[in-house]
């Protein structure tokens, strides 16, 4: 630690709401919400298909325990380790994206996104997103001047993103591609790159996105059903219409925990991608807004921590925190928007809430990294404050 760093003394200020407790409390609240809602949403399906009503909830409790354990490990890893390990993390991220396309990968519903690891299947896009954001955060810090003032410096990280995006689209995992590219672009923008630099990129991505939709029949059907789900409510629009019915049944305060009808084999993926619709059905619009508010508080606390780190001169910690926060916020926002019909179906889980081991553990690691950044910033502020106090003790400084 550098004792001479001069930063504002934030902690302990009367009446100021600290972001770290907010980050932890909202994360735990969402984690508990997820376990409760998976218990409700999955019981009937688990009983009918697996003969054990508690199959999914028991596994989710185990995943939650593993997530908390990995978070405790991650919060004790210095931020400098992530910065030094950028190339290693990039290699891991790209390697898992390649391995899933080999016979090691597992295909479910036409998508090859998982590698079996015994207890659970690792969704490689979750691992890759965190690894790539860590590498790109390091690049932004190391090559800041080149990134800000030259086109080659700006295009190099986009090349890395391009390779990862191609590997994700091959799986195919279009939703993860959107989240990764948008979060990375947002992180680079927050580092100081002019918005005008992104305009050509936005145009290219829009063109590529259109091509991907038009050339893949299932994506085209999703877009068409998104525009008018009731036109084909028993085929391409089925999932969205059932989700909207769940929201309608919930009204203001819901039908009560465990009383959902849509989870009874009407709404596919009720315990994963569309768990937000079950929350809305059982707890109503008010319950859905509470979950939305928890995610908003989590994202704001993450951004505040990143901003404080930036002011304290912790460039990598700030950039990495921005990236992780954007990953979580974008995925949550897209998932909830899909459930309400604001976006086409993407196949993304709701972070910390939906069933799934790899997504949960990677999210817990990301939150732990943000917490570590804030703890290191507080440590710097305390050392700086103590040093300043020692230098001015007695009202004078003597050589």
UniProtKB/Swiss-Prot annotation:
Q: Which residues cross the membrane?
A: 19-39, 61-81, 85-105, 114-134, 160-180, 198-218, 285-305, 314-334, 350-370
Q: What would be one Gene Ontology cellular-component term for the protein?
A: cell division site
GO-annotated molecular function = lipid-linked peptidoglycan transporter activity; peptidoglycan glycosyltransferase activity
The EC number(s) attached to this protein equal: 2.4.99.28
Task: Describe which pathway this protein belongs to, using the record's wording.
Answer: Cell wall biogenesis; peptidoglycan biosynthesis
The listed locations are:
Cell inner membrane
Membrane topology, as annotated: Multi-pass membrane protein
Q: Which UniProt keywords apply?
A: Cell cycle, Cell division, Cell inner membrane, Cell membrane, Cell shape, Cell wall biogenesis/degradation, Glycosyltransferase, Membrane, Peptidoglycan synthesis, Transferase, Transmembrane, Transmembrane helix
**Database matches in PROSITE patterns:** FTSW_RODA_SPOVE
Name the enzyme's class.
transferase
GO terms classed as biological process = cell wall organization; FtsZ-dependent cytokinesis; peptidoglycan biosynthetic process; regulation of cell shape
Q: Give the catalysed reaction(s), semicolon-separated.
A: [GlcNAc-(1->4)-Mur2Ac(oyl-L-Ala-gamma-D-Glu-L-Lys-D-Ala-D-Ala)](n)-di-trans,octa-cis-undecaprenyl diphosphate + beta-D-GlcNAc-(1->4)-Mur2Ac(oyl-L-Ala-gamma-D-Glu-L-Lys-D-Ala-D-Ala)-di-trans,octa-cis-undecaprenyl diphosphate = [GlcNAc-(1->4)-Mur2Ac(oyl-L-Ala-gamma-D-Glu-L-Lys-D-Ala-D-Ala)](n+1)-di-trans,octa-cis-undecaprenyl diphosphate + di-trans,octa-cis-undecaprenyl diphosphate + H(+)
Q: Which domain of life is it from?
A: Bacteria
Which family does this protein fall into?
Answer: Belongs to the SEDS family. FtsW subfamily.
The protein depicted here goes by the name Probable peptidoglycan glycosyltransferase FtsW
Q: What is the lineage of its organism?
A: Bacteria, Pseudomonadati, Pseudomonadota, Gammaproteobacteria, Pseudomonadales
């Amino acid at each position: 630690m550098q004792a001479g760093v001069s930063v504002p003394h934030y902690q302990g200020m009367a009446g100021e709401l600290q972001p770290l407790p907010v980050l932890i409390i909202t994360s735990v609240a969402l984690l508990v919400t997820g376990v409760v809602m998976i218990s409700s949403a999955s019981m009937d399906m688990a009983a009918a298909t697996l003969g054990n009503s508690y199959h999914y909830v028991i596994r989710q409790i185990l995943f939650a325990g593993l997530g908390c354990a990995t978070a405790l490990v991650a919060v004790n890893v210095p931020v400098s380790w992530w910065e030094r390990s950028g190339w290693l993390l990039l290699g891991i991220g790209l390697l898992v994206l390649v391995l899933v396309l080999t016979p090691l990968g597992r295909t479910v519903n036409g998508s090859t996104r998982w590698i079996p690891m015994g207890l659970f299947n690792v969704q490689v896009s979750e691992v890759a997103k965190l690894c790539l954001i860590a590498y790109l955060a390091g690049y932004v810090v190391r090559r800041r001047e080149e990134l800000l003032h030259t086109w080659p410096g700006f295009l190099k990280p986009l090349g890395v993103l391009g390779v990862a995006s191609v590997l994700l689209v091959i799986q195919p995992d279009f939703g993860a591609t959107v989240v990764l590219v948008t979060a990375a672009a947002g992180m680079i923008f927050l580092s100081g790159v002019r918005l005008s630099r992104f305009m050509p990129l936005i145009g290219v991505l829009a063109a590529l996105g259109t091509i991907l939709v038009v050339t893949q029949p299932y994506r085209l059907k999703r877009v068409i059903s998104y525009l008018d789900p009731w036109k084909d409510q028993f085929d391409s629009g089925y999932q969205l219409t059932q989700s909207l019915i769940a929201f309608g049944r919930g009204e203001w305060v819901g039908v009560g925990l465990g009383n959902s009808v849509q989870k009874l084999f009407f709404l596919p993926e009720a315990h994963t991608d569309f768990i937000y619709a079950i929350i809305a059905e059982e707890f109503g619009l008010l319950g859905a807004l509470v979950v939305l508010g928890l995610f908003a508080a989590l994202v704001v606390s993450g951004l505040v921590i990143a901003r404080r780190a930036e002011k304290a001169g912790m460039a990598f910690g700030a950039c990495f925190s921005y990236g992780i926060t954007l990953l979580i916020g974008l995925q949550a926002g897209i998932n909830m928007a899909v459930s309400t019909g604001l976006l086409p179906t993407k196949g993304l889980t709701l972070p910390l809430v939906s069933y799934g081991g790899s997504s949960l553990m990677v999210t817990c690691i990301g939150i732990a990294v943000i917490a570590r950044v804030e703890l290191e910033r507080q440590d710097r502020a305390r050392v700086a404050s103590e040093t300043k106090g020692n230098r001015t003790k007695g009202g004078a400084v003597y050589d």
